[in-house]
């Protein structure tokens, strides 16, 4: 009995030890099952959070793509509206300039016809004055002729009476009284001779010769015929000039009425275009407000995406560290406790290195862009200097046929972010210089107009100076139209270049959107596949350790 009891005691001790070890193993197994349940819960939560994050990322990417497409469409519409508006303004400016040129030409023709009318009026007044003077002279000559004819008739009657008296005396007296008769006749003849001499002296005092008395009647008739003929000819010329003036005045009035109608139509078209421009500006303002709202939403979504990425990265790092600790804890009994920890550390260092390289790449691109902008600004400054020197040379030469161009202030960069303090000060000095040049040009124009006014006063006294002034005015009008056409052509070329640049930008953005859209679609499909695989792994509780390590390695490469 003692021997059997001695044999049973070590067996009982061994059974007790085995039961204790079994209890310890059961406790350890329960703890491991609890840890496994916790890890499965964590993996389920990780898969759920990953699906949520992936869905949020997909939605945010889709929203970003939609917003970018809408922005591109808005930019295209605004560019089209701007091009249409600029084309309409260009056409309206051309029509206004042509109408103004036609109106100025009509005004010049009207002024010319008014000057001709004034000259014809002055000539008519001079002809009327000459006619009145000739009529007065004719009346004076006629009165003198009548007085002389009356005196001549009286003298003829007296001579007849004397001759009759002499004949009577000769018939009544005889030959014996010849001496007394001859003496009386001599006395009468001397008296008659004295009377004739007195009459001749009186006629010579009036500057009329006796032999001219016979031709006065013929000259009077000839003068009357000439005066009447000149009056008829002058009257015909006056009637013809009146008819020509009336026809020209009627033509000018018709052309002015037509020009007024065209001007009203142009004003109506301008009002319509202004109304359209107001509507388009309202649409543009609304689109700009929508663009600002979308930009704000985009920035907000980008911030949310950045926060989610950071949260996802931190949670992934924490989960990887937990998994590494768990794997190291389970593998510590096998003598390989630092392998998983080392792998996870290497993976995190690779992720940090990739982020650091991306940041360095972006910083290098920003530096390169800044360097390119500085080079462009330097080239622009050198071009401005060359343009200023060439313009000053043209202004110093004094050649009026060559247009020196606008001041250099029109070609300066107005963006303050691209300019330094020295550049801003130079721009301010260029503005002051341009303002002073415009003031000098205005003063020269005023002086030229005053000189032209004084010259116009002198032109009224001479036709040659008037023609020169008209030629100068036509030359100035041609220069004005030429300058306006050059400005419009320059503006048109600038608009075309801007349109080409905008088209290139739209094409680049479209290519960028297409490429990234395809890449995002591929990434979304890949993430969905990965999410499906991760869910299957989370459901299977007896997954081997090699598959877990491969999944972690794949996730590290994806990050």
Curated annotation (Swiss-Prot):
Restricted to multiciliated cells. Keywords: Cilium biogenesis/degradation, Coiled coil, Cytoplasm, Cytoskeleton. Its main location: cytoplasm. GO terms for biological process: cell projection organization; de novo centriole assembly involved in multi-ciliated epithelial cell differentiation. It comes from Xenopus laevis (African clawed frog). Residues 9-327, 419-541 form a coiled coil. Induction: Highly up-regulated in the ciliated epithelia of embryonic skin during the developmental window of centriole biogenesis. Expression is probably activated by mcidas/mcin. Residues 1-19 have a biased composition (Basic and acidic residues). InterPro entries: CCDC78, DUF4472. It comes from the Eukaryota. Belongs to the CCDC78 family. Residues 1-20 are annotated as: Disordered. It is found in: Cytoplasm, Cytoskeleton, Microtubule organizing center, Centrosome, Centriole. One of its GO terms (cellular component) is centriole. Signal peptide: none annotated. Component of the deuterosome, a structure that promotes de novo centriole amplification in multiciliated cells that can generate more than 100 centrioles. Deuterosome-mediated centriole amplification occurs in terminally differentiated multiciliated cells (G1/0) and not in S phase. Essential for centriole amplification and is required for cep152 localization to the deuterosome. The keyword Coiled coil applies. This is Coiled-coil domain-containing protein 78.
């Amino acid at each position: 009995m003692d021997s059997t009891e001695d044999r049973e005691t070590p067996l009982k001790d061994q059974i007790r030890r085995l039961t204790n070890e079994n209890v310890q193993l059961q406790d350890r197994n329960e703890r491991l099952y609890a840890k496994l349940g916790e890890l499965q819960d964590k993996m389920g939560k990780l898969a759920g959070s990953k699906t949520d994050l992936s869905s949020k990322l997909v939605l945010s990417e889709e929203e970003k793509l939609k917003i970018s497409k809408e922005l591109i469409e808005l930019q295209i519409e605004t560019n089209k509206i701007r091009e249409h508006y600029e084309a309409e303004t260009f056409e309206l400016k051309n029509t206004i300039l042509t109408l103004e040129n036609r109106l100025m030409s009509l005004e010049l023709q009207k002024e010319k016809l008014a000057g001709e009318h004034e000259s014809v009026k002055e000539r008519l007044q001079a002809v009327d004055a000459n006619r009145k003077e000739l009529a007065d002279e004719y009346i004076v000559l006629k009165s003198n002729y009548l007085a002389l004819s009356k005196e001549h008739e009286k003298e003829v009657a007296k001579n007849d009476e004397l001759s009759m008296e002499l004949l009577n005396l000769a018939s009544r007296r005889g030959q014996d009284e010849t001496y007394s008769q001859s003496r009386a006749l001599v006395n009468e003849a001397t008296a008659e001779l004295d009377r004739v001499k007195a009459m001749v002296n009186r006629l010579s005092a009036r500057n009329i010769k006796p032999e001219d008395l016979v031709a006065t009647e013929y000259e009077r008739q000839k003068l009357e015929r000439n005066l009447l003929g000149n009056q008829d000819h002058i009257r015909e010329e006056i009637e013809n000039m009146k008819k020509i003036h009336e026809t020209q005045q009627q033509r000018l009035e018709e052309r002015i009425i037509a020009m007024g109608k065209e001007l009203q139509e142009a004003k109506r078209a301008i009002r319509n275009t202004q109304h359209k421009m107001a509507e388009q500006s309202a649409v543009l303002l609304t689109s700009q407000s929508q663009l600002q709202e979308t930009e704000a939403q985009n920035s907000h979504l980008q911030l949310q995406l950045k926060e989610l990425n950071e949260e996802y990265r931190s949670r992934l790092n924490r989960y990887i560290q937990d998994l590494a600790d768990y794997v190291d804890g389970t593998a510590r009994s096998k003598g390989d406790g630092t392998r998983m920890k080392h792998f996870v550390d290497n993976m995190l260092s690779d992720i940090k290195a990739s982020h650091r390289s991306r940041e360095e790449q972006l910083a290098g691109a920003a530096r390169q862009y800044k360097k390119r902008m500085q080079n462009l600004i330097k080239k622009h400054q050198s071009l401005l200097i060359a343009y200023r020197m060439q313009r000053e040379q043209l202004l110093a030469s004094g050649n009026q046929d060559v247009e020196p161009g606008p001041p250099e202030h029109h070609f300066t960069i107005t963006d303050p972010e691209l300019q330094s303090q020295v550049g801003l000060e130079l721009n301010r000095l260029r503005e002051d210089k341009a303002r002073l040049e415009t003031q000098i040009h205005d003063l020269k124009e005023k002086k030229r107009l005053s000189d032209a006014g004084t010259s116009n006063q002198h032109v009224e006294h001479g036709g040659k100076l008037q023609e020169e002034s008209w030629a100068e005015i036509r030359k100035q009008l041609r220069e004005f139209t030429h300058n306006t056409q050059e400005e419009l052509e320059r503006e048109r070329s600038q608009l075309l270049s801007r349109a080409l640049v905008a088209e290139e930008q739209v094409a680049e953005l479209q290519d960028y959107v297409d490429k990234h859209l395809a890449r995002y679609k591929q990434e979304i499909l890949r993430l969905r596949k990965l999410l499906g695989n991760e869910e299957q792994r989370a459901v299977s509780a007896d997954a081997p350790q090699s598959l877990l390590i491969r999944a972690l390695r794949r996730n590290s490469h994806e990050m």
